[in-house]
Amino acid sequence: MIYIVRDQKVMLDSDLAKLYGVTTKRLNEQVKRNTLRFPSDFMFKLNEVEFLALRSQIATLDIGRGKHRKYLPMVFTENGVAMLSSVLNSD
């Protein structure tokens, strides 16, 4: 799903992980290993206020017992999604 955050169209790391058939943990590990390829206009971490606002709008962000996120999610802009595809497919 595409969301609007900070006046930018973005996708959540968890949605992209499902799309690429990897875990969110693996996706974020690859991003950390390739940080120079992801400048701030490609991706950013949501702050707590942004995450709570987004969570209140999205039924798919499950907050049940044992289903909460340990960390605030990363979101990727269109350029970030393209770079992520390159990084994940190069493994």
Task: Go through the PLM ranges and name each one.
Residues 1-91:
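Basic, low-complexity intrinsically disordered segments
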